[in-house]
Amino acid sequence: MNATEQAANGDRGTTRSAGGRLRYLLHAPGACQLMGVHDGLSARIAVAEGFEALWASGLCMSTARGVRDSDEASWTELLTLVGTMTDAVPGVPVLVDGDTGYGNFNTARRFAGRAERVGAAGVCFEDKVFPKMNSFFGDGHQLAPVAEFCGKIRACKDAQRDPDFVVVARTEALISKLPMEEALDRAAAYAEAGADALFIHSRMNTPQQIATFMERWEGSTPVLIAPTTYHTPSVDDFAALGIAGCIWANHSMRAAFAAMRDVCQRIRTDRGIYGIEDQVAPLKEIFGLFDYEGLEKDENCYTQAPDLAAVQG
């Protein structure tokens, strides 16, 4: 029984791979939540707080690398960061934001293959041309031809090793201010090409575009969204529309950004740290998250001198 069949039968049993677990979540009743992360620390925190799946955000990883979300970081750099996430939270599904696939079908399938090898559950590619700009900045978002993008999807599906590895197709038609018909047509074409899930993106400040899309969507392929700008509805509200998953794409990084900026300002202004201790995490919380006590126990176990008398009989 594959992960899709498990979800249909209400079976929450473990699956063989991270891809299988993500596939299960996308087909289970309701809308799953994927927390945006950018490194091993943010992944550990998200999982410790109960998230069952993670989104390795291109914006957040690029920002953590100190560059813009405009394909300035190489895909090998980003997948190195993804590896820190899968190492930090083994078994937890990580869906990787693969931007446009960094070129043609060949670079897209190479990206997907490398993501699979570092332990990711799946990849998501968007239908803009390379190089891209972040969807929430500016208006110059040119889309790739449908046939070209479908070729990327097919190439990735043909090359995957794990049958449960998830390939998500993201359309930027609404971001590019194209008609709803264009978004629906592209979604249908991408599903036909083999996409395991669809990501419908909007930057309106209400969910109306998403609601309209779901009312008119006749396919069975799961639909993901990232409600970054239309942030009033709850997960349950989106589930009622038929959404399979909500991606909280960049909130962890933005929270860290604000906290780091504020503490830097405070220390510089106060010329000391006497006023910030109650605003930062205690070291014991960090030691606890990374199981320092476990390491100490292992040291006692593995570095004690052997009892030579016992060894010699």
Swiss-Prot record:
<comment type="pathway">
    <text>Secondary metabolite biosynthesis; bialaphos biosynthesis.</text>
</comment>
<protein>
    <recommendedName>
        <fullName>Phosphoenolpyruvate phosphomutase</fullName>
        <ecNumber>5.4.2.9</ecNumber>
    </recommendedName>
</protein>
<keyword id="KW-0045">Antibiotic biosynthesis</keyword>
<dbReference type="InterPro" id="IPR012698">
    <property type="entry name" value="PEnolPyrv_PMutase_core"/>
</dbReference>
<comment type="similarity">
    <text>Belongs to the isocitrate lyase/PEP mutase superfamily. PEP mutase family.</text>
</comment>
<comment type="function">
    <text>Formation of a carbon-phosphorus bond by converting phosphoenolpyruvate (PEP) to phosphonopyruvate (P-Pyr).</text>
</comment>
<dbReference type="InterPro" id="IPR039556">
    <property type="entry name" value="ICL/PEPM"/>
</dbReference>
<dbReference type="GO" id="GO:0017000">
    <property type="term" value="P:antibiotic biosynthetic process"/>
</dbReference>
<keyword id="KW-0413">Isomerase</keyword>
<dbReference type="InterPro" id="IPR015813">
    <property type="entry name" value="Pyrv/PenolPyrv_kinase-like_dom"/>
</dbReference>
<dbReference type="GO" id="GO:0050188">
    <property type="term" value="F:phosphoenolpyruvate mutase activity"/>
</dbReference>
<dbReference type="InterPro" id="IPR040442">
    <property type="entry name" value="Pyrv_kinase-like_dom_sf"/>
</dbReference>
<feature type="active site" description="Nucleophile">
    <location>
        <position position="69"/>
    </location>
</feature>
<dbReference type="Pfam" id="PF13714">
    <property type="entry name" value="PEP_mutase"/>
</dbReference>
